[in-house]
A protein has these predicted regions:
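Class I S-adenosyl-L-methionine-dependent methyltransferase module
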Residues: 1-133
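A short acidic, Gly/Pro-enriched loop at the edge of an enzyme's catalytic core
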Residues: 143-159
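Flexible loop/turn segments at secondary-structure boundaries
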Residues: 147-150, 167-170, 199-203, 227-230
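A short SAM/SAH-binding and catalytic strip from SAM-dependent methyltransferases
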Residues: 157-172
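A short glycine-rich, Lys/Arg-flanked "PGG" loop and its adjoining helix->strand segment in the class I
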Residues: 173-187
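Conserved beta-strand signature within the Rossmann-like core of class I S-adenosyl-L-methionine
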Residues: 187-199
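Core SAM-dependent methyltransferase catalytic element
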Residues: 214-243
Length: 243
């Protein structure tokens, strides 16, 4: 978590831990069933002080101090403010997503992984040899996405993970990026991208080639263990447009 926003979320996690107290935080991670977790959130965790904390942390002045500008944010989740939106997202993470398997929440609240068995797949011991044998396949490029993708030959990529990079792009820049995705993608290539606060979608005139998988998108969003994103969406590139 090294970016400005990631650093802010890390700070918010520390603040929540102090506010709730270590005993209450550990109590959340002790819940073994979903019903126990839901009841704990409803009757122990979700205090007036906890809810008010979001108004303190997630406001324009506080965000500006952390180098984040909130003026461009809009909401497509029914929230009236930045604070309301992030309260709703935290509620989902702490109440509805199984806490025992959520290593993101563990990092946010405990500052560490709570169990060696509940870590990202790349950190699991059983995957070490596979990763070690294939590490030469990893290539790191530091550049703007559009400049990088312009160097890639046609029909060569089978997966795109675009995070939320479109949020600060203009409509023209977004259209250019997704046009390049179509050009460089193999047929049936998969795409995943996210929205933090600004609603973004594949440009309408490209949707015949980039088709959204609505059921998979809903499943990914409903089970997303990182609560900060307001949208998780999956797509398939279909170059003939008629599958």
């Amino acid at each position: 978590m090294n970016g400005k926003f990631e650093g802010f979320i890390k700070l918010a996690g520390k603040f929540i831990s102090i506010l709730q107290g270590r005993k209450k935080v550990l109590g959340l991670f002790d819940k073994k069933t979903q019903k126990e977790q839901e009841d704990y959130f409803d009757h122990v965790w979700n205090t007036r002080r906890f809810r008010y904390m979001f108004k303190i942390l997630f406001n324009k002045k506080m965000l500006a101090k952390r180098g984040l500008v909130a003026d461009y944010f809009t909401f497509d989740d029914g929230s009236k403010s930045f604070a309301d939106s992030f309260y709703n997202r935290s509620r989902k993470a702490f109440r509805d997503i199984p806490i025992q398997s959520n290593y993101f929440t563990s990092l946010y609240l405990l500052g560490k992984y709570n169990s060696l068995n509940v870590v990202p797949a790349y950190l699991k011991e059983e995957n070490f040899e596979t990763i070690k044998s294939r590490v030469d396949r990893i290539k790191i490029f530091t550049n703007e996405a559009q400049k990088w993708i312009d160097t890639i030959p046609d029909h060569t990529i089978d997966c795109f993970a675009l995070s939320n990079i479109c949020e600060l792009m203009s409509e023209k820049e977004t259209h250019s990026l997704f046009s390049s995705v179509i050009r460089t993608a193999k047929d049936d290539a998969r795409i995943i991208f996210r929205n933090l606060m600004i609603p973004r979608e594949v440009p309408e005139d490209l949707r015949n080639s980039i088709k959204k998988d609505e059921p998979l998108s809903k499943k990914l969003f409903d089970t997303d263990r990182s609560f900060v994103y307001g949208k998780v969406a999956a797509y398939t590139v279909q170059k003939n447009g008629n599958k």
